[in-house]
Amino acid sequence: MQVLHVCSEMFPLLKTGGLADVIGALPAAQIADGVDVRVLLPGFPDIRRGIPDAHVVSRRDTFAGKISLLFGHYNGVGIYLIDAPHLYERPGSPYHDTNLYAYIDNVLRFALLGWVGCEMACGLDPFWRPDVVHAHDWHAGLAPAYLAARGRPAKSVFTVHNLAYQGMFYAKHMDDIELPWSFFNMHGLEFNGQLSFLKAGLYYADHITAVSPTYAREITEPQFAYGMEGLLRQRHLEGRLSGILNGVDEKIWNPESDLLLASRYTRDTLEEKAENKRQLQIAMGLKVNDKVPLFAVVSRLTNQKGLDLVLEALPGLLEQGGQLALLGAGDPVLQEGFLAAAAEHPGQAGVQIGYHEAFSHRIMGGADVILVPSRFEPCGLTQLYGLKYGTLPLVRRTGGLADTVSDSSLENLADGIASGFVFEDSNAWSLLRAIRRAFVLWSRPSLWRFVQRQAMAMDFSWQVAAKSYRELYYRLK
């Protein structure tokens, strides 16, 4: 079984979000599971620099100009790169310029990604041809459409990492991307009078996956589907929509071997975690005190992530004696709110605006509770890192958060399945009730340690996801 992942970024070569983490870990796990997997990426400068052995496999004159297909390796995974400097070698992010304006030719830049994915199934590399083209998010959404236009030379899977991003372009661009105009209708890639790369992936793929079982159910409902609920409900009824939970890259996120921690530990040596807490308290300007629970946030500061709820609930958390360590950036109003709270409560609240991968490890290793109160969360990785590090997640019951964290209720404690704290409603009162439950459990150190060990014993490795994807591919074949 030969599988080609088509996507726009890959950790650690290039990362703007969680998609990169998935592509940075899933292919290697699939190779270990016996699947012949390769990855197709645009030739962005950071990616090119990370694959110095890339050599030319093929050259083509395309609707987006002359390109070369390169092939190399990264960490044992075969990587195809689309070498098109006129499209991909630019300042700014992969998607927008330094002024945060989307590149005006994004329609060509990412249509080309889907087109090359299809051409791989038609023999663009004469020595390797995929049985399954696995496209990720809107950037690769046209790959299933091109495959459909070419008579489906390979099966296709489309994974939704976040349905909110839809890749919308003017209808006139149908003339530019070499897809038939017959595809531009409601039973195709048209959405609200425009061309939607996301809808193309959803409509033409042989199977759709979401990044958690709960999110796969949620996106069939209007409040989560951004207008796509009709199509997704139909795919669900046809058995062509499922959820496969993302995993944790244990080579990077593992408290037993994490060199970014002051003190490494396992579920059997949790007492070693205390030194990480002490160092984190010092780094964040908090009072060094191992008797109070240290709550943490590592997140984009947005309402979607529920950080407005944290800001509203923060006085109640601090009044109970807790501490807060926050690392993140985003909404200026939220940034200012948290900075003001830290200034008002020195020694109790510490805030760092920005994102630093290394410091996020130190927070995960040192905190007692990680807050993930998202309004929606397709999968979420932060809570998985918390479970792995014995930093109990406090989450809202949505998407992947609902699939991965079990509340420390009396019943769950008795059944040995408690792993954190879960609340239902998107309001500060509901969040504060969950925070109160965390304080109650904290007052019972032996129970707290029991839940930590339960959390750390859970298996959210990529090997589990790789097995599920392999079974899906073989069902399609």
UniProtKB/Swiss-Prot annotation:
Entry GO CC: cytosol
GO biological process: glycogen biosynthetic process
Gene Ontology molecular function: alpha-1,4-glucan glucosyltransferase (ADP-glucose donor) activity; alpha-1,4-glucan glucosyltransferase (UDP-glucose donor) activity
Enzyme nomenclature, EC number: 2.4.1.21
Residues involved in ADP-alpha-D-glucose binding: K15
Alphabetical list of InterPro entries matching this protein: Glyco_trans_1 (IPR001296), GS/SS (IPR011835), Starch_synth_cat_dom (IPR013534)
Glycosyltransferase is among the record's keywords: yes
Highest taxon of the lineage: Bacteria
Pathway membership: Glycan biosynthesis; glycogen biosynthesis
Catalysed reaction, written as an equation: [(1->4)-alpha-D-glucosyl](n) + ADP-alpha-D-glucose = [(1->4)-alpha-D-glucosyl](n+1) + ADP + H(+)
Broadest EC class assigned to this enzyme: transferase
Keywords: Glycogen biosynthesis, Glycosyltransferase, Transferase
Pfam short name (any one): Glycos_transf_1
Family: Belongs to the glycosyltransferase 1 family. Bacterial/plant glycogen synthase subfamily.
Described purpose of this protein according to its UniProt entry: Synthesizes alpha-1,4-glucan chains using ADP-glucose.
Protein name: Glycogen synthase
Originating organism: Salmonella typhi
